[in-house]
């Protein structure tokens, strides 16, 4: 847990331009791992914030015509500042509007990580792909999708699901930790985007080890929280997840991590 230990010591400032539904949960999750979240949205202050921040999360869950230009502006300012961006294209396949905006953003600015479920990432590489919302039940080959997305966008790809896939450079990793309760809590996936950002430490081309650790810390914490005798369902799971992120130790991490490199 080299990266998590560093976070707990250095408290990296992590800027989150995220959706209205999840701001509180995302901020509390980042605080739980030791990061310092700032939910700054104004392009007018971005240049000053980005000089001292360690990463930027952009999550388009509540995209509107009113915030389109702000998102593009802060992404470009982050590029100018050398600040890595984690981009979460929430429900990109649910509407033509979202898909067009996401593609515009990816043409307008360079992001360091694209994080989404298989349907969302597929929508970024296949104009015919559709989905029902933030999740899809369709079986998809996440490794193949991640590799194709990496080839197109030349940026690290994190695909979440029952198993999580990370592709960076010539490496493809499958992770198999987590809990079904994550799908019953709104904003869990959005929090993961924030946690990934917290692990970047101004690395615009992040080491795959940082991404592996970020995803594994989150999912192992979810496993432990779900197994807690006080966890009765989604309502008790959420605070237990935060507590477990706060207390997670090296022994638990090493005992539970389930990782496989694939071709």
From Swiss-Prot:
The record's section on Gene3D superfamilies has: 3.40.1190.20
Catalyzes what?
Answer: 5-(2-hydroxyethyl)-4-methylthiazole + ATP = 4-methyl-5-(2-phosphooxyethyl)-thiazole + ADP + H(+)
Q: What is its EC number?
A: 2.7.1.50
Name any cofactors this protein relies on. Mg(2+)
Task: Tell me which residues bind ATP.
Answer: 115, 160
Say which enzyme class the record assigns.
Answer: transferase
Alphabetical UniProt keywords? ATP-binding, Kinase, Magnesium, Metal-binding, Nucleotide-binding, Thiamine biosynthesis, Transferase
Q: In which pathway does it act?
A: Cofactor biosynthesis; thiamine diphosphate biosynthesis; 4-methyl-5-(2-phosphoethyl)-thiazole from 5-(2-hydroxyethyl)-4-methylthiazole: step 1/1
Query: Residues that bind substrate, according to the entry?
Result: 39, 187
| Presence of keyword Nucleotide-binding | yes
Q: Name one GO molecular function term.
A: ATP binding
The family classification in the record reads: Belongs to the Thz kinase family.
Function in brief: Catalyzes the phosphorylation of the hydroxyl group of 4-methyl-5-beta-hydroxyethylthiazole (THZ).
The protein here is known as Hydroxyethylthiazole kinase
Organism from which the protein derives: Staphylococcus aureus (strain bovine RF122 / ET3-1)
